[in-house]
């Protein structure tokens, strides 16, 4: 089965403290039937790092994973949240935005 959200996609957060923010998917994390995505600038937490040989310690801002159900792909034409469908064009399976019909990616 093809994934509806892939790394590199522009997404918008639907729920949570970062609701309405837009970011790019950096990485998709799959662990035991839970699919999560790491999105740039979304769900940022502070991590306290101890100083080690070669690097100084301090407070590092780190993006944590957010559940796939809490984000939606942005329509490339209207810049609005959209659902994703699949269709075959020239014997290639492609994703398209259901709002505008534009091909994604």
UniProtKB/Swiss-Prot annotation:
Claim: rRNA-binding is one of the keywords in the record: yes
Keywords: Ribonucleoprotein, Ribosomal protein, RNA-binding, rRNA-binding
Superkingdom of the organism of origin: Bacteria
PROSITE patterns: RIBOSOMAL_L24
A single cellular component GO annotation: ribonucleoprotein complex
GO molecular function, one term: structural constituent of ribosome
Biological-process GO terms, alphabetical: translation
Family matches, as SUPFAM superfamilies: Translation proteins SH3-like domain
Keyword presence, RNA-binding: yes
Family listed: Belongs to the universal ribosomal protein uL24 family.
Function per UniProt: One of two assembly initiator proteins, it binds directly to the 5'-end of the 23S rRNA, where it nucleates assembly of the 50S subunit.
HAMAP family: Ribosomal_uL24_B (MF_01326_B)
Subunit record text: Part of the 50S ribosomal subunit.
Protein name in the entry: Large ribosomal subunit protein uL24
């Amino acid at each position: 089965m093809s994934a509806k959200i892939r790394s590199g996609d522009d997404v918008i957060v639907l729920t949570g403290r970062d609701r309405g923010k837009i970011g790019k998917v950096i990485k998709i994390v799959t662990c035991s039937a839970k699919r999560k995505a790491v999105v740039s600038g979304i769900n940022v937490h502070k991590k306290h790092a101890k100083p080690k040989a070669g690097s100084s310690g301090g407070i590092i801002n780190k993006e944590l994973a957010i559940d796939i159900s809490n984000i939606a792909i942005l329509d490339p034409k209207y810049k609005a949240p959209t659902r994703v469908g699949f269709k075959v064009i020239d014997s290639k399976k492609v994703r398209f935005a259901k709002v505008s019909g534009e091909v994604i990616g």
